[in-house]
């Protein structure tokens, strides 16, 4: 998932493909997914189980403008001037949803 989110490199509030990817994974893991939370198309809340304790996990998966980069150890943009992941949100988002996997 992290590699796919890296390739999507979608800016904040525009992460349609990334959000869909994460939500589909959670549904396959038997989570109930509520989409479009607080009027934000890409925001979602996924729940599973009941009772206590309640555990909440935040997943961020937005990219930053102007930082397009192929997954190589030297500067090589995927798209000149495009967006990219420079602070690990592709990993953060994927790991956050994977933390709830069964």
Where are each of the predicted segments found?
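Flexible, small-residue-rich helix->loop connector segments that border functional cores
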Residues: 98-102
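Acidic/His- and Gly-rich active-site-bordering loop/insert found
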Residues: 1-85, 90, 94-97
């Amino acid at each position: 998932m992290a590699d796919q989110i890296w390739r999507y490199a979608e800016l904040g509030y525009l992460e349609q493909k990334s959000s869909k990817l994460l939500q589909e994974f959670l549904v396959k893991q038997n989570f109930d997914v509520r989409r479009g939370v607080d009027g934000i198309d890409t925001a979602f809340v996924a729940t599973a189980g009941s009772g206590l304790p309640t555990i909440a996990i935040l997943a961020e998966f937005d990219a930053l403008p102007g930082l397009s980069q192929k997954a190589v150890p030297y500067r090589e943009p995927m798209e000149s001037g495009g967006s990219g992941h420079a602070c690990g949100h592709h990993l953060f988002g994927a790991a956050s949803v994977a933390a709830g996997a069964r």
